[in-house]
Amino acid sequence: MWREAMMELLDQLEAENPEDPALAPKDLSEWACIYIKYLQIMRKLETAYDQMVHPQKRQDMRKALEACIGRMLEIRHWMVKLNRGLDFINLDDILVDLKLGPEVLEVPVPKYFIEDRAKELDDRDKFLEALIEKYNVKGPAASPIIRIGAPLGEDEAILMIQKNERGRQARERARLAAITKRQRQIEDRRVRLGVTLSHEEAARKIQAAIRGFLWRRRIKKEADKELMFIGMKPKPRDPKRDPQMGEAKNLMRRKRVQLEHGREYDEAIVNLKGKVRELEGQDMRETIQDKVNAWFVEKRNPDTGEYPDFPDPDDGGSRAILNPPPPSLASLLEDAAGDGKGKGKDGKGDAKKDAKKDPKKDKKGGGDEPQAEEQKIGAVFIPAIEAAVQEFVAKWQDRDEADNFHQKYDAELVKDELRPIVFEEIRLQVDGEMRVLLQNLKDLVEAERAAKLGKKGKKKKGKKKEPFSRIKKELLKEAKTLAPGERVLVLGNSREPYLCAKKDEKDAAGDGKGKGKDGKGGGKPGTAGSKPGTADKKKKGGKKKSLCSDWSCGA
């Protein structure tokens, strides 16, 4: 029944929105046929939802049922508009054409409206009973009707009592007279017959009447058996085999199974949620952290090194980072306009001409009165119906349930439903951690900036130059890591740079002193070398001493 109703819902959507707009329903009779069809679908969905014991199917079925009810009310409201605002719509001719009875138009009230609120209604009744008992208030049916009027005088009261008493006595005399008349008639009939029955004769007459009744009943039973044997009369129903009684018992059993399966489903949600968090929570956390860290690096300012602000929780937090929204139409138009700026002047001129022509056309057409927009039926519940149909097709249409005879919950479907919930909870936790991390990074950047500004201020005040001995030690450490033939350009607080090379390689490097393969400087291409012309400069005070025994330095 559920499958049939969902297929009919899909057919209804296609009938309301056909590919050819000319075939769309327009007049009242067409919408009335669609309304009746929705009523039939709603009745099927309501029956299926009431009898279904699978907890997950009941959830999806209820979504489809509520969407169908909403769409039916939308069509009903639209039919009232087409009927010139009259709420009563005559659908007799349409029922005759469709060969349906008037009971089709009765809107059934879904049973879950009362069943889901049973506890609430019971609590309300108990509360009202407690209030009535507390304040000793009697119900309206038990309270006597008191008519307040002018008080009677003593004489009037006596006359009224006497009148009522005379009426009672007259009614009693009439009853006794009727009894006496009946007895007199019986005696007169006996006298006219002239025969007085004895006790034996009276007993024989009674026996004859009883025997006649018994034989007539026996013959009637035999006649009924004959008719049942030839198939002219149905057999009497056994109360134990009554189909209505069996249906009622089956309904009660299904309701009991519904409660049991629903209770098991609620318990499974709690247990499976913990398992999903335990098995897949760490992977979810790492995925979120990786994407947020990549966003930090991508959005960091390359010039200042500042990090962006983390989105507020009210704006969704990292949800926009994990699932960035698609570009809007305005941004696409801006990008297209930016690409069009590189075109020639002709393109600009044409655009200007078109821009000038459009306002003129608008001005010419401005004299016409705006046409009233055509009213359309509401379509609020159509997306809900489409989503319900798609969910049914994707989840239940081709699902093999041969192993689920008792129609209990499906653990895999429960996990699929719980993964987004667990992911959202972990995302909120990671957001809090990443906010703390981002604040620490910002504080670190601010500290580095403040340190740089402090060093610059000290240099401006005239800080003493570092001693040459410290530079010598650092140069020796760096020189040990160099490959043969590499050069080191000393930069820092020394007044002049020095080129260093090992003594045994000085002769090989001395032929092109200060020149590399390109002739621009010592060292391999891509390594640090001396500045052009630095080797030709003469130092004041003569040649410097070598830094060590194994290294020679020259300017």
Swiss-Prot record:
Q: Which residues form a coiled coil?
A: none
- SMART domains linked: IQ (SM00015)
| Chain segments carrying region Disordered | 232-255, 299-377, 450-469, 501-555
Alphabetized, the UniProt keywords read: Cell projection, Cilium, Cytoplasm, Cytoskeleton, Flagellum
What InterPro entries is this protein classified in?
IQ_motif_EF-hand-BS, N-DRC_Component
- Which Gene3D superfamilies does the UniProt record give? 1.20.5.190
GO cellular-component term (any): axoneme
* Biased composition annotated in UniProt, kind: Basic and acidic residues: 235-244, 338-367, 501-521
The protein's location, in the record's own words, is: Cytoplasm, Cytoskeleton, Flagellum axoneme
Q: Does the keyword Cytoplasm apply?
A: yes
Q: From what superkingdom does this record's organism come?
A: Eukaryota
Compositional bias (Basic residues) spans? 452-464, 537-546
Tell me the protein family, please: Belongs to the AAA ATPase family. DRC11 subfamily.
What is the protein's known function? Answer: Component of the nexin-dynein regulatory complex (N-DRC), a key regulator of ciliary/flagellar motility which maintains the alignment and integrity of the distal axoneme and regulates microtubule sliding in motile axonemes.
**Description of how the protein assembles with itself and partners:** Component of the nexin-dynein regulatory complex (N-DRC). Interacts with DRC5.
Protein name (Swiss-Prot/TrEMBL): Dynein regulatory complex protein 11
Source organism of this protein record: Chlamydomonas reinhardtii
